[in-house]
């Protein structure tokens, strides 16, 4: 139910994000405190992070998503009538150019009656508090999605505006924590250096994914999986991608979500080209150091930096 989701999943989404930031601040205090006997109270840090950072931030993002068309309600799922009926085969495939006679409930294709075809006149539309759940799943690098197909669903991510907001939310806190680190250790150049190292890795990965998805491969072109560019479509490997996002929006999300250990998707990464899919897996296998999860990405990068200094 919506209540169990709010009490279970949503609470854990906030707590998991706050935990990563709290651990990071304990590490930062270990760097800057010399004569102190402690590293602060974890529970105080956790409460402050949730109340002063995560709740206000996600309230704003939720309102932006609702304004962009993401659903946010407590209604049960609805069944609505289609504008016009469609015919599907016994295997569930839509029959193109089918002539439907609702009076006799027959389906005709190329002048022949399809006996096992079914006429669909209604559609199941899920409801619920999606916008608030999407906001924390992104800002907390929790991943997953409210709908089964994640942020590829038009009710969870309906247009380019919501897509932009959700993509920015993935890296918003991990990127900001780099500058927080520089400010905390009273050496902002350190924070900028770490941010630039992460950012350059992300840009290279994003460029590789975008180029390979736009160009495709000869094998995909021969099989008809790579669409030719048209006025309404930029072309490229559009298999597993939403036309409202295209190659650019899908590739950017793929790079961001795998760099930040987020896990949410707006396209199916299994359908990417071999090189494009390889880069997404490489970002995951780097161990959450290209921005990474909230808090844990930065202290992972700091661990690598410390090892590098001594090795």
What name fits each language-model region?
Residues 1-311:
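Membrane-proximal intracellular helices of multi-pass ion channels
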């Amino acid at each position: 139910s919506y209540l169990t989701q709010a009490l279970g999943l949503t609470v854990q989404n906030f707590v998991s994000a706050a935990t990563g930031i709290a651990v990071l601040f304990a590490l930062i205090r270990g760097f800057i405190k010399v004569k102190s006997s402690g590293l602060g109270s974890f529970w105080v840090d956790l409460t402050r992070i949730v109340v002063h950072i995560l709740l206000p931030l996600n309230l704003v993002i939720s309102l932006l998503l609702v304004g962009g068309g993401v659903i946010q309600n407590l209604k049960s799922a609805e069944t609505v009538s289609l504008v016009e009926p469609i015919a599907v085969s016994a295997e569930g495939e839509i029959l193109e150019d089918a002539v439907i006679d609702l009076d006799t409930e027959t389906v005709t294709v190329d002048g022949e009656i399809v006996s096992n075809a079914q006429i669909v006149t209604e559609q199941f539309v899920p409801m619920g508090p999606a916008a608030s759940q999407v906001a924390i799943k992104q800002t907390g690098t929790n991943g997953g999605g409210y709908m089964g197909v994640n942020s590829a669903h038009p009710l969870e991510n309906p247009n380019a505006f919501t897509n932009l907001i959700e993509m920015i939310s993935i890296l918003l806190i991990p990127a900001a924590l780099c500058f927080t680190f520089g400010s905390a250790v009273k050496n902002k150049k350190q924070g900028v250096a770490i941010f630039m190292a992460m950012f350059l890795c992300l840009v290279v990965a994003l460029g590789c994914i975008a180029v390979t998805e736009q160009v495709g491969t000869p094998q995909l072109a021969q099989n008809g999986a790579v669409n030719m560019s048209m006025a309404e479509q930029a072309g490229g490997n559009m298999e597993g991608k939403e036309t409202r996002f295209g190659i650019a929006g899908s590739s950017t999300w793929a790079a961001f979500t795998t760099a930040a250990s987020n896990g949410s998707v707006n396209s199916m990464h299994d359908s990417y080209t071999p090189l494009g899919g390889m880069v997404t897996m490489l970002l995951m296998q780097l161990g959450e150091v290209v921005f990474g999860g909230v808090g844990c990405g930065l202290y992972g990068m700091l661990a690598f930096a410390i090892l590098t200094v001594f090795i």
